UniProtKB/Swiss-Prot annotation:
This is Small ribosomal subunit protein uS7. Part of the 30S ribosomal subunit. Contacts proteins S9 and S11. One of its GO terms (cellular component) is small ribosomal subunit. It comes from Wolbachia pipientis subsp. Culex pipiens (strain wPip). Coiled coil: none annotated. The lineage of its organism: Bacteria, Pseudomonadati, Pseudomonadota, Alphaproteobacteria, Rickettsiales. It comes from the Bacteria.
Length: 158
């Protein structure tokens, strides 16, 4: 039997800061179901960032995610044998998910490149996103550049 409405996501807030956003991020960086290790990594990185800047760790994290969150993306649309990249607005939930994934991916890339610990790389990536630079912010800028380049096809919206 079909649902009338889409089921709401039930993400509980994290234990230390009471933030649903931070728990979503912990779930993204978690590997092989080891949530306690993912929590240690996230909390350690946030406490290092808090010491470095001097502001509340949760506000630093929320600002970093906000700076990396895209508002537009391109989707492929096939019309008459040709495929066009059509810029469309993103739902808020998907935009935040993209931002969190980009921060995690940039952290992983920095860790492989530099050989430093995950905590240090995550802390530096959060601070980079907070200061509007770094790998995750670069991914966000690439989304905007693609949308800007394909602005002519915006009339082909879904």
């Amino acid at each position: 039997m079909a649902r009338r409405n889409k089921a709401k996501k039930r993400t509980s807030p994290d234990s230390r800061y009471g933030s649903v956003l931070l728990m979503r991020f912990i779930n993204i960086i978690m590997k092989c179901g080891k949530k306690s290790i993912a929590e240690k990594i996230a909390y350690s990185a946030l406490s290092l960032a808090e010491k470095k800047i001097g502001k509340d760790a949760l506000s630093i994290f929320e600002t970093a995610v906000e700076n990396v969150t895209p508002s537009i993306e391109v989707r492929s649309r096939r019309i008459g044998g040709a495929t066009y990249q059509v810029p469309v607005e993103i739902r808020q939930d998907r935009a935040i998910s993209l931002a969190l994934r980009w921060i995690a991916r940039a952290t992983s890339a920095a860790r492989k490149k530099s050989g430093r610990t995950t905590v240090y790389c995550l802390q530096s990536e959060i601070l980079d996103a907070y200061n509007k630079c770094g790998g995750a912010f670069k991914m966000c800028e690439e989304k905007y550049k693609m949308a800007e380049a394909n602005k002519a096809f915006s009339h082909l919206r879904f």
